Amino acid sequence: RNMLSFARMPFQAIAQQQVKTGGYSAEYGRSLGGIVSIVTKSGSNDWHFGGSVEWEPEWGKASGKDVWERDPDAADPLYQYRSDNTSSSLIYSAYASGPIIKDRLFFFALAEGRDNQTDDYYSLNSRKTSDTTPQGFLKLDWYITDNNLLEFTGLYNKRKTKYHTYDYNLTADGENRYNVGRHEAPIEQYEIENGGKLGILKYTGYVTDNFTLSAQYGYLSNLIDSRLPANPPGSECPWAYSFGLTTSVVD
């Protein structure tokens, strides 16, 4: 339930979203100005099963609009080429929850799959992206006694997006072809990884009606735009452009 602000949660695993603007406990660290806390779903003595499907097919979307240059003599009259771009998204999940030991040990488990596809076409090249990475979530609640609770929260949300880039084939005269609208000559392919793993173990002891003891340990492994294979040395250098401008400067 805590420390999840650094990890993407499957939507169907969220029970509540809380906004705290003050008076929150030390488990939220030294944050200032308020926090957003996610409360995950948990199991109970009742069995529950369910699932969801979110589908955004390519044929259900309007085509993008091209943006044209005002200069009719421009080599590429299209400023932004969008009309052939396509995208589709499919996210599906299934969950189950219930008692492992009645009145004492409960679970909530969820698995989520996805199939997201995008085709982007530019003036001189194109790119295809796909994401089919599964994700999972597990919550265990163990009431050791009526006054002692042990909770485990586990999350796997690593996401791999595959990229394929292409050039448009040249004409018979070796000239560039613009706005072809299909993938032709492969250039490279690579993956971008985001997310990772999260594990939280929390103990809560209700000592008296006015005194509660809580202890928590968490582990988080999170990647941000990690590329495989890695970029070659020097790729982090900035781009440099040279324009044929006429100036009054004489070398």
Describe the function of each predicted region.
Residues 27, 47, 57-62, 224:
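Short, solvent-exposed loop/turn elements at domain surfaces
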Residues 6-54, 91-103:
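A beta-strand signature from Gram-negative outer-membrane beta-barrel systems
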Residues 1-21, 64-87:
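Short acidic/polar hinge/loop motifs at secondary-structure boundaries
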Residues 34, 68, 233:
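Glycine-rich, phosphate-binding/catalytic loops in enzymes
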Residues 48, 82-161, 190-213:
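Transmembrane beta-barrel wall of Gram-negative outer-membrane proteins
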Residues 23, 53-59, 102, 113-117, ...:
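Transmembrane beta-strands of outer-membrane beta-barrel pores
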Residues 2-3, 61-67, 76, 119-124, ...:
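Short acidic, glycine/proline-rich loop/turn micro-motifs
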